From Swiss-Prot:
Catalysed conversion reaction: L-methionine + ATP + H2O = S-adenosyl-L-methionine + phosphate + diphosphate
GO terms under biological process: one-carbon metabolic process; S-adenosylmethionine biosynthetic process
Lineage: Bacteria, Pseudomonadati, Pseudomonadota, Gammaproteobacteria, Enterobacterales
Protein name per Swiss-Prot or TrEMBL: S-adenosylmethionine synthase
Compartments reported by the entry: Cytoplasm
Cofactor binding note: Binds 2 divalent ions per subunit. Binds 1 potassium ion per subunit.
A GO CC term assigned to this protein in UniProt: cytoplasm
Cofactor(s) recorded in Swiss-Prot or TrEMBL: Mg(2+); K(+)
Organism: Klebsiella pneumoniae subsp. pneumoniae (strain ATCC 700721 / MGH 78578)
Gene that this sequence comes from: metK
Amino acid sequence: MAKHLFTSESVSEGHPDKIADQISDAVLDAILEQDPKARVACETYVKTGMVLVGGEITTSAWVDIEEITRNTVREIGYVHSDMGFDANSCAVLSAIGKQSPDINQGVDRADPLEQGAGDQGLMFGYATNETDVLMPAPVTYAHRLVQRQAEVRKNGTLPWLRPDAKSQVTFQYDDGKIVGIDAVVLSTQHAEDIDQKSLQEAVMEEIIKPILPTEWLNASTKFFINPTGRFVIGGPMGDCGLTGRKIIVDTYGGMARHGGGAFSGKDPSKVDRSAAYAARYVAKNIVAAGLADRCEIQVSYAIGVAEPTSIMVETFGTEKVPSEQLTLLVREFFDLRPYGLIQMLDLLHPIYKETAAYGHFGREHFPWEKTDKAALLREAAGLK
């Protein structure tokens, strides 16, 4: 492979689309805490002074959607009207219905193992050994930059920062290996009274330098910090936000393919979410086992049917055993039926709000990030 550049982006928890994702997942978590078998499809729209929460929810639980919404916005940091959005005064509207019984009859079964997929669709999972968390470096470091922005905003190190921010990192590759960082973009909302020069210096010292490895930076690395020169108006005042509009940020930063389904606000019966998590789990264990340097899994489903309609393993020529053997190992060691993967990853718990900002993958405490099957896979593949 020749030299090439690859870029990924991330957005902060205060980005309008991420506010929406976090509200949707906060509602999901509150419901799952009371009713693990609930059916939830919760969508959120945010704009200046308003939050609209809608969707289809079937549950025995009762939750206070207005309180959940305000608490989520407050935790993110929108607590003053001068930010253009205020948790204490924004309107919260609810438009919740029930899941269609036509869908429900295809999902629920007397035998849980025969639980059907909540919809048709295709999902991808990916892993690569280019970082310690077996994720692509561009999206990993893009996430870490905006996580650091939130950290120094909340701990008072840079008190003039505001919640909305975006990052973008361009890596240089040579023959598939990282050789450096070519460009870094970081745009952050800020208070009115900070000048551009002071902001750029502080962002470089407190956000960028602590995160990016020095061995990947050189004299030709380009830095773009608030390149428009001003970012006072941000958050929902600057742009409306919608659940499910940052699906590439949520996954692999464009390094792997995407089936198109969003995650946030969906309970685990929705394979858009749960099967994408399972596909990551499979791919990560294959790479952790040393069976390939890079691995992409595709799985697909028919609505109301338990067995996947297809499973595909792609290793981009990096496999250490034949591809056909890898596919057989996946079928042997991973139950990718909807009920099977829910049990395999223990998904019926309120764990989802935390996924809704800074990426669903590459953070070790999530159950789909375990590599507990790596040793079994390696042994079964006949590798020492």
